[in-house]
């Protein structure tokens, strides 16, 4: 969870501030802008009772807005026992930079509720979630125009559905009510492709890295993703989708998966679907027959591999284990998985890191698409799909008439099929991740003081935010 007492005494919030300070030093910005960039503009703390098993139980939650230079502000809500204000503020800041990096026009926010969702029944969680939503709505920290939450650790489409329904009941005349949260079930205004978005974005980030030969050569990795050995830490939503798509579509070998009860190793590559089904059925990865079980998952982080994908908690790579990490490339699918001090150690060893502020931005990119869909009140592709199919058919017919040859059915089907919402969302996500990587890469190459992708990403983000601050008179 939050690294308030991280190794070396540097919290997650302090790690983010260190990166901002370093970027601003490189850019030569004034101290006033430095303080504005680091300040969390507002934090709401709420405490409320909910009746659980016949007695009142108190719950405490937070919602932080780091920057409202763009509205609405955006960021997930997590349910976890160790969530605290420090963590929420750090994650809100990260959301500001993340949105700027991938050109999503939102400010940064984050929320958390201190509880273990596994301890409560579905009905109890619904009551807790609806009450938390009411507290946020009452304080104007949840609305389509001001603050738009999304799922995070411990929450998902179900909780977002409860929140949007709570908002709708309070504001039945708000025609845009579905835009008050994203990550909703498709039946309640969600967009197809949101559930896979963060993991899919990790895949697209890695693909773009390997498309640029100079970048992959720097990491000592040749060719494309095919055959690359990948270790994934965390088989939740993000880890599962990243592992599944990389193995199924890019033919990477996911040689190990680390979970809370241990890890499973198979040098020939794990069957990710089978492993995920086993975890769902048994509550962990122990006992899975498709690999060797290792009870100490921390050891598996240090196994030889090409790519390491930490996809769960903050602070899993610290000064204690950074020297033992053997991966050539780390793709930060989680927020803050590498501590500030560990980052410096890894960079000194030449380990390339695709930073969290870019690598896991797929979720907020597709949340942006969902928010647009909610304001437009129409699914993507509805107006144009059949038009493009008809036009494609006319083109095929023209080719056949001119050539006198029959176009094979598989080519016909591929060219004629109109794009549906899934296709358009994936296309938009792919384009966003590609463009952002190229901006980060160009920024790194433009200044010898920028030594790595993380610093390039922060400089890029701060340039965009500072420009916005100046334009609106901050």
Where are these regions (language model features)?
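Adenosine-phosphate binding glycine-rich loop
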Residues: 3-11, 209-210, 324, 328-474
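Short, Gly/Pro- and small/polar-rich lid/capping loops
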Residues: 4-45
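Conserved active-site and cofactor/substrate-binding residues in soluble primary-metabolism enzymes
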Residues: 11, 15-18, 41, 83-86, ...
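Glycine-rich, N-terminal phosphate-binding loop and its surrounding beta-alpha-beta segment
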Residues: 45-53, 58-117
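Glycine/serine-rich phosphate-binding loop and adjoining beta1-alpha1 elements at the start
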Residues: 80, 100-226
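Glycine-rich phosphate/diphosphate-binding loop of Rossmann-like nucleotide-binding domains
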Residues: 189-302
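Rossmann-like adenosine-cofactor binding region
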Residues: 262-353
